[in-house]
A protein has these predicted regions:
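Acyl-donor (CoA/ACP) binding surface of acyl/acetyltransferases
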Residues: 1-17, 21, 56-137
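Short secondary-structure capping micro-motifs at structural edges
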Residues: 45-46, 70
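Short loop/turn motifs at secondary-structure junctions and domain boundaries
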Residues: 47-53
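Alpha-helix boundary/capping residues
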Residues: 21-25, 34, 48, 131
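Conserved GNAT-fold acetyl-CoA-binding loop/helix
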Residues: 26-44
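Secondary-structure transition/hinge residues
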Residues: 26, 49, 105-108
Length: 137
């Protein structure tokens, strides 16, 4: 069973896991931002508790952490999302994206999802296109 846990509710061990994933070269190379510092990461997670425009989740398949999804710039019409899977696992991209879309349309009640991907992130682009997303500039 897939479940989400908000970053602001993560244990220190879970936050350290997300920190390690976020700074893993296999993940980080697809981010616009550089690596994140330890204190900055923990402060960011704490700040999300009071931020209505952002939602970040650690996603579990049963009790196994499989990835991270997030929503930013949330409005009544749309939001931008981000997604990455545990760099030590394979095959969870579709599961993460499917659950992300379900949450966005059902809980956030947005009408449109927007994602950004670097041009060389072909896996993400193929995944998004497979779900019916369209490319823009």
């Amino acid at each position: 069973m897939i479940c989400f846990k908000e970053f602001s509710a993560l244990s220190p061990v879970e936050l350290e896991l997300v920190f390690a994933w976020r700074n893993d070269e296999r993940i980080r190379k697809h981010f616009i931002n550089e690596s994140v510092g330890y204190d900055e990461h923990f402060a960011f997670a704490k700040s999300l508790k009071d931020d209505e425009n952002k939602r970040y989740f650690l996603v579990f398949d049963d009790e196994k952490p499989i990835g991270v999804i997030n929503f930013v710039s949330i409005s009544k019409d749309e939001c931008e999302f981000g997604i990455y899977q545990n760099p030590n696992l394979r095959g969870f991209g579709r599961i993460l994206l499917s659950n992300l879309a379900h949450y966005a349309f059902r809980n956030l009640r947005v009408k449109r999802l927007v994602a950004r991907a670097l041009k060389d992130n072909t896996k993400a682009i193929r995944l998004f296109l497979g779900f019916g997303f369209t490319l823009t500039s």
